[in-house]
Amino acid sequence: MEVNKLIEELVEVIKDRKNDIIFSYLFEEESDKILKKIGEKSSEVIIACKNASKEEQVHEISDLIYNLMVLMMKQNIEIENVIEELGKRRNMTLNKKSTKSVYPSIH
């Protein structure tokens, strides 16, 4: 499936679930629940990447991306905003004469 189409469908799923009682606790105005969920999922990604199979890593990374998208929706951040920022960083990297990148280095 095309990535853009998949992201669009995922955004629609999140919008549809926003009013679901079980899911809506993540959207509570004064709640840190989504932030805690992202912390939990981030830890699970780290552990999976250290100890688990590729299948488990993909599963945990997918959970993290989903929860980040929920947070983005709660904060009124569109996926296009993130894509635009990534494009700016890419262009900045390409335009720099030095090899220093605006992306965090991977060690």
Curated annotation (Swiss-Prot):
GO terms for molecular function: ATP binding; phosphoribosyl-ATP diphosphatase activity. It catalyses: 1-(5-phospho-beta-D-ribosyl)-ATP + H2O = 1-(5-phospho-beta-D-ribosyl)-5'-AMP + diphosphate + H(+). The gene is hisE. Pathway: Amino-acid biosynthesis; L-histidine biosynthesis; L-histidine from 5-phospho-alpha-D-ribose 1-diphosphate: step 2/9. It comes from Clostridium tetani (strain Massachusetts / E88). One of its GO terms (biological process) is L-histidine biosynthetic process. This is Phosphoribosyl-ATP pyrophosphatase. GO terms for cellular component: cytoplasm. It holds the Pfam family PRA-PH. Its EC number is 3.6.1.31. Its main location: cytoplasm.
